[in-house]
Amino acid sequence: METISRQNKPQQQLIGAHMSAAGGVHKAVERAEAAGATALQVFTRNQRQWNAPPLEEHDAELFTAAVRRWGGYPVSSHASYLINPAADTPEGAERSVALMADELQRAGRLGIEMVVVHPGAHKGQGEAAGAALAAARLDEALERCGSPAVMVLLENTAGQGTMLGASFAGLAAVIEASRMPERYGICLDTAHAFGAGYDLRDAALYDAAIRELDVCAGLDRLRLVHANDSLTGLGSRRDRHTHIGQGELGEAAFRLLMRDERLHHVPKVLETPKGKGPEEDMMNMAVLRRLACP
């Protein structure tokens, strides 16, 4: 399946949300369009189960047609939370590789270019060993999937337990250990970064964080931002999202993010609390757009 992209890149920033695929993955596109989003993240299968029905060709056709009608805005998928690329057992490793390969294959069939995944937990093996294992397993999934246009986006974490990727150097370590680093990018989650100790509220500290990301991995690898406020404090090592401007990060951090010309082209996707309708997403997107204006 060919990837879908916009012919004319918009001048405004691309802002969207993770949308439900209830009723069919194409419904997520319809929900994004109805909310006024210009970026989208989806689950292409049940994210909390190891096994899922195969993606039917009809469903793939409905999805790609919906994306074209919407305008070809960027779409990413988020891989299952069950995947642990740094698993410390052969069984856990094989299950994670097989599931990640399925995620990548589904994305390829849907024309989705980016699959976000957490780098995993090293379970006491140490960060260096965990990074090497994560790279080897993700490389294997990329080889199995048969979708050469799809990129793995490693998402930074809040550093809970033995989770890898709390630091930008930790994300870079996985990429450096890969045999195919050109297939990897980075997804920056603002709430996770804050939980891991990156203070994004102060201009100087925010700039230092982005410069650190650039030095460690290169800003050219940053393909997606998860714009989430945090219910928990700086360095809490906890992952709790809330509405933009209503958490510990506050509007100051997102004003810096939205006015950072280095990241102007990077899609910003919300993973904030939802209600029964699109109102919460529309509210949060409106806040981001407002903060982008000088």
From Swiss-Prot:
Zn(2+) 1 binds at H78, H118, E155. SUPFAM superfamilies: Xylose isomerase-like (SSF51658). Keywords: DNA damage, DNA repair, Endonuclease, Hydrolase, Metal-binding, Nuclease, Zinc. Its EC number is 3.1.21.2. Binds 3 Zn(2+) ions. InterPro entries: AP_endonuc_2, AP_endonuc_F2_Zn_BS, Xyl_isomerase-like_sf, Xyl_isomerase-like_TIM-brl. It catalyses: Endonucleolytic cleavage to 5'-phosphooligonucleotide end-products. Zn(2+) 2 binds at E155, D189, H226, E271. PROSITE patterns: AP_NUCLEASE_F2_1 (PS00729), AP_NUCLEASE_F2_3 (PS00731), AP_NUCLEASE_F2_4 (PS51432). GO terms for biological process: base-excision repair. Its cofactor is Zn(2+). GO terms for molecular function: deoxyribonuclease IV (phage-T4-induced) activity; DNA binding; DNA-(apurinic or apyrimidinic site) endonuclease activity; phosphoric diester hydrolase activity; zinc ion binding. Zn(2+) 3 binds at H192, D239, H241. Disulfide bonds: none annotated. The keyword Zinc-finger does not apply. It comes from the Bacteria. HAMAP family: Nfo (MF_00152). Belongs to the AP endonuclease 2 family. Endonuclease IV plays a role in DNA repair. It cleaves phosphodiester bonds at apurinic or apyrimidinic (AP) sites, generating a 3'-hydroxyl group and a 5'-terminal sugar phosphate. This is Probable endonuclease 4. The gene is nfo.
